[in-house]
Regions:
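Structured alpha/beta reader/binder surfaces that contact nucleic acids or chromatin modification marks
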Residues: 1-119
């Protein structure tokens, strides 16, 4: 499985991005939860969607089971984990349409390097 980090490729590559929120279908959410439950924790990071001529730029390992979170519950501490592109939580919420009740899937991970231990 893969995730595209189109807006935050540099932050993914330098390891500072450790969380991403996605507006995924129930099916996609369940697939990621199943991967966690089955111990399939390593996945590919891409610079953009492969259908848009993206390329694989690295690998990452899930560090928590994917979960859903209301945008209004977005912790300020996650601004840096999301790549640091948004100065405030409200800026991030506005990017997502401004609805604090919108629910997104949260994926927490760490970027793997060639010598990263996979636990």
């Amino acid at each position: 499985m893969l995730i595209s980090f189109a807006w935050t490729t540099p932050q993914f590559l330098d390891g500072s991005k450790t969380a991403t929120r996605r507006d995924w279908s129930d099916l996609t959410f369940k697939q990621w939860c199943k991967a966690w439950d089955e111990g399939r924790l390593t996945h590919d990071g891409w610079d953009k969607n492969p259908r848009c001529k993206g390329k694989k730029v690295g690998r990452f390992m899930l560090t928590a089971r994917p979960y859903r979170e209301r945008l209004g519950d977005f912790p300020e501490s996650d601004l840096a984990a999301e790549g640091g592109l948004w100065p405030t939580v409200q800026d991030y919420i506005n990017l997502q349409g401004g609805d604090q009740d919108k629910v997104l899937v949260v994926i927490r991970f760490r970027k793997l390097t060639e010598d990263s231990p996979i636990e």
